[in-house]
């Protein structure tokens, strides 16, 4: 009499899930995430059982996310399958367990780890869990809150570009100008200090009488094309406004050279404010901004230029405010001071000696 193969209880306990347990930080803000599933694609880093791998891309250009542990261990540890951070406090599970002493570390032997995971899976299926945050003592909870303020879920600040990176971006921009045989560079850089770029803008009309366009730097997404058109129409009729929000730049093309000269004369220092947005303006001949790569490069240069100009404006504003305060102090009259009354001075006429 032949018998079938003996069933393996460990294989019966292998997981087959349709969706992972991931925190919002790892999943990202996109509501339409494309996720791939690979059943039994790896070994869980906690219980060493085969588990399903889920992969996804949070944002374009970033490294794909991936699950590291099985769903059972994630629920038992109350952590994310990808970053393995606690879902309540945002801390590494080893630090959390040491502080709160809620979850045991478990066995280290492979076979014992599988047996331990089976028992925990059975508890979860019955609606029980070994993790209970209410059991934490007040002292341990205060310790976790102190560590939580310094831990991982705060986003790191954006790194500023240094002089080397700024010069590399500028070098690429000059190479693009040379390939187009451009007479005037889009970004006439004067100097670079601490990653900030200052321009040497010359608002004198160019010798080429055919140039009747102005080039704007620092065009944000909130500044629409029609607002730029509305601002410059006061100086004369416009031929077109070519705006690239991705490059943070725009060309304002006038129908006549005289209108362009009037608009340039209105901004002798190369600064213009449109609907509350501060921009840099200079003469420029319309041309391509270099495709997607060139637009990204020009956007970085525009950020460096606007950051450098804002730094200079802050210094000048401080000195201006200080001068205004000094003038106000000089022009302010001293307040009237009441003279104290002598207590021996007679208050009534009858008390005055004759």
Swiss-Prot record:
- From the Swiss-Prot or TrEMBL record, state where the protein is found: Nucleus
Q: Which PANTHER family match?
A: PRE-MRNA-SPLICING FACTOR RBM22
Q: Which family does it belong to?
A: Belongs to the RRM SLT11 family.
* Single Gene Ontology MF annotation: U6 snRNA binding
Which InterPro entries does the UniProt record give? Cwc2/Slt11, Nucleotide-bd_a/b_plait_sf, RBD_domain_sf, RRM_dom, Slt11_RRM, STL11/RBM22-like_N
Recorded hits in SMART domains, A to Z, give: RRM
Note the subunit structure: Belongs to the 40S cdc5-associated complex (or cwf complex), a spliceosome sub-complex reminiscent of a late-stage spliceosome composed of the U2, U5 and U6 snRNAs and at least brr2, cdc5, cwf2/prp3, cwf3/syf1, cwf4/syf3, cwf5/ecm2, spp42/cwf6, cwf7/spf27, cwf8, cwf9, cwf10, cwf11, cwf12, prp45/cwf13, cwf14, cwf15, cwf16, cwf17, cwf18, cwf19, cwf20, cwf21, cwf22, cwf23, cwf24, cwf25, cwf26, cyp7/cwf27, cwf28, cwf29/ist3, lea1, msl1, prp5/cwf1, prp10, prp12/sap130, prp17, prp22, sap61, sap62, sap114, sap145, slu7, smb1, smd1, smd3, smf1, smg1 and syf2.
Does the entry feature the keyword RNA-binding, yes or no? yes
Ranges for the RRM domain?
212-286
Q: What is its main location?
A: nucleus
Origin organism of this chain?
A: Schizosaccharomyces pombe (strain 972 / ATCC 24843) (Fission yeast)
User: What keywords tag this UniProt record?
Assistant: mRNA processing, mRNA splicing, Nucleus, RNA-binding, Spliceosome
What domain of life is recorded for the organism? Answer: Eukaryota
Q: What GO cellular-component annotations does this UniProt entry give?
A: nucleus; post-mRNA release spliceosomal complex; Prp19 complex; spliceosomal complex; U2-type catalytic step 1 spliceosome; U2-type catalytic step 2 spliceosome
Question: What is this protein's name?
Answer: Pre-mRNA-splicing factor cwf5
Task: Give the UniProt record's GO annotations in the biological process aspect.
Answer: mRNA cis splicing, via spliceosome
So what does this one do? Facilitates the cooperative formation of U2/U6 helix II in association with stem II in the spliceosome. Binds to RNA. Involved in pre-mRNA splicing.
Question: Which residue windows does the record flag with biased composition (Polar residues)?
Answer: 310-323
């Amino acid at each position: 009499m032949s018998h079938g193969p003996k069933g393996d209880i460990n294989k019966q306990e292998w997981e087959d899930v349709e969706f992972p347990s991931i925190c919002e930080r790892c999943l990202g803000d996109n509501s339409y995430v494309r996720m791939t599933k690979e059943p039994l694609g790896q070994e869980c880093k906690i219980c060493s059982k085969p588990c399903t791998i889920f992969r996804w891309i949070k944002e374009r250009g970033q490294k794909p996310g991936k699950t590291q542990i099985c769903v059972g261990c994630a629920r038992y540890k109350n952590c994310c399958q990808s970053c393995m951070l606690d879902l309540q406090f945002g801390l590494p599970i080893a630090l959390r367990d040491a502080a709160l002493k809620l979850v045991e570390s478990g066995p280290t032997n492979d076979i014992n780890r599988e047996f331990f995971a089976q028992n925990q899976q059975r508890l979860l299926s019955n609606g029980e869990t070994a993790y209970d945050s209410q059991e934490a003592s007040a002292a341990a909870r205060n310790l976790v809150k102190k560590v939580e303020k310094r831990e991982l879920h705060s986003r790191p600040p954006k790194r500023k570009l240094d002089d080397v990176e700024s010069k590399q971006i500028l070098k690429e921009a000059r190479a693009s100008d040379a390939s187009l045989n451009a007479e005037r560079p889009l970004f006439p850089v004067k100097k670079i200090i601490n990653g900030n770029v200052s321009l040497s803008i010359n608002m004198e009309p160019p010798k080429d009488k055919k140039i009747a366009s102005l080039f704007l730097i620092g065009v944000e997404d909130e500044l629409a094309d029609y607002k730029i058109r509305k601002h410059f129409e006061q100086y004369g009729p416009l031929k077109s406004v070519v705006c690239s929000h991705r490059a943070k730049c725009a060309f304002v093309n006038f129908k006549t050279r005289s209108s362009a000269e009037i608009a340039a004369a209105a901004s002798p220092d190369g600064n213009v404010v449109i609907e509350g947005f501060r921009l840099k303006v200079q003469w420029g001949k319309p041309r391509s901004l270099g495709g997607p790569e060139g637009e990204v490069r020009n956007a970085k240069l525009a950020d460096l230029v606007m950051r450098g100009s804002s730094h200079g404006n802050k210094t000048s504003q401080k000195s201006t405010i200080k001068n205004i305060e000094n003038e106000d102090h000089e022009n302010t009259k001293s307040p009237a001071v009441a003279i104290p009354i002598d207590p021996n001075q007679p208050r009534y006429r009858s008390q005055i000696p004759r």
